[in-house]
């Protein structure tokens, strides 16, 4: 028993240091968590526009297109980076109820352009740059 007590006294500082260093390395190596950002479909002044119209995000972030005030609105991606599918990212269903939303996670760096089918001619278009 005395043998184990003397070992623990000698190695306790070393063991503590090893645990501290290992914990620090594990925490510092953790990837940054992905963010969720919102784009309003329609402005607070009832204009048929996306707000903001242009957005920059990090790869892996999620964009929520939130129905604001009056619709109907949708999100159709037309130009996307190579390797992505515009139809797969798009939401053709028209949102009508305020507060309803459509989420999409963008993982490939590049520029994504999108529009609202009913209001494209009125300028309801936007871009997302993924870095």
UniProtKB/Swiss-Prot annotation:
Major subcellular location class: membrane
Family: Belongs to the plastocyanin family.
Keywords from the named record: Copper, Electron transport, Membrane, Metal-binding, Signal, Thylakoid, Transport
Annotated Plastocyanin-like domain residues: 35-131
Family annotation (Gene3D superfamilies): Cupredoxins - blue copper proteins
Signal peptide: 1-34
HAMAP family noted in UniProt: Cytb6_f_plastocyanin
Lineage: Bacteria, Bacillati, Cyanobacteriota, Cyanophyceae, Prochlorotrichales
Pfam families: Copper-bind
Name by which UniProt lists this protein: Plastocyanin
Chain's role: Participates in electron transfer between P700 and the cytochrome b6-f complex in photosystem I.
Cofactor(s) the protein requires to work: Cu(2+)
Repeat is among the record's keywords: no
Domain of life (superkingdom): Bacteria
CC per GO annotation: plasma membrane-derived thylakoid membrane
Bilayer topology: Peripheral membrane protein
Keyword Signal: yes
Compartments it resides in: Cellular thylakoid membrane
Spans through the membrane: none
Gene Ontology molecular function: copper ion binding; electron transfer activity
Binding site for Cu cation: 73, 116, 119, 124
InterPro entries the record matches: BlueCu_1, BlueCu_1_BS, Copper_blue_Plastocyanin, Cupredoxin, Plastocyanin, Plastocyanin_cyanobac
